[in-house]
């Protein structure tokens, strides 16, 4: 066999693999920062579209508390401080959408800060119990950025990670909604300090979006469900009590009317002599 022919035959699978990879990377992705539509200045709205179809939607308010150290007044020790970082509206968005995994990356201040949210699906495709969840959170930061951190803070880029996360578990095909504030602890590479992420006014759907920019049916978090029950329970009890009172009044009225129409029989036997 000709050497050139053999070489060409061997190259074909490699070329096909490269073409496949290249075509996948060419998948057209659009990111939308729609935070300006929210009346709440602290709330952010994001959407990711691939090939003209919305594949991830997210709305939430995020605040991050980061402990860090600055030199003490004696210039020997270190004092512990805490930075409060609000997710701003002018955020750079990136993301990825796959069948069973999705990611949302949010960066700001020239990527001095980056918040990454990871989502995954669970269960078999044919199973009715199939669901999705937030499976991982990463926050990247550098205390030497002086817009938020005090000067003199220990420099160095750090990453705060979640461990064994299973948040916002939602039935497949539904969106997740939670007005209540959720507190999530992350462990930092900065001497294992605990970074705290607060999420509120959350509405998320990282999979199975049927219409562009339209959430599927909402699955409310347990806290919101309890709050809704607490708000509606007094109304239900009031209506039940009102109906019970109406029934009692109606029964009394009917009973009174029936007894009024009956012939009154004298109880004193001496009165019987006047009868007949």
Swiss-Prot record:
User: Transmembrane region positions?
Assistant: 232-252
Its keywords, alphabetically, are:
Cell membrane, Cell projection, Cytoplasmic vesicle, Endosome, Glycoprotein, Membrane, Signal, Synapse, Transmembrane, Transmembrane helix
- InterPro entries hit by this protein: Lamp2-like_luminal, Lysosome-assoc_membr_glycop
Q: Which residues lie on this side of the membrane: Extracellular?
A: 28-231
Q: What modifications follow translation?
A: Glycosylated.
Q: Where's it mainly located?
A: membrane
Q: Where in the cell is it found?
A: Cytoplasmic vesicle membrane; Cell membrane; Cell projection, Dendrite; Cytoplasmic vesicle, Secretory vesicle, Synaptic vesicle membrane
Query: Any keyword ATP-binding?
Result: no
Tell me the PROSITE patterns matching this sequence: LAMP_1
Chain ranges sitting on the Cytoplasmic side read 253-276
Q: What does this protein do?
A: Plays a role in short-term synaptic plasticity in a subset of GABAergic neurons in the brain.
Report the sequence similarity comment from the record: Belongs to the LAMP family.
Q: What is this protein called?
A: Lysosome-associated membrane glycoprotein 5
- Per the UniProt entry, what species is this protein from, by scientific name? Xenopus tropicalis
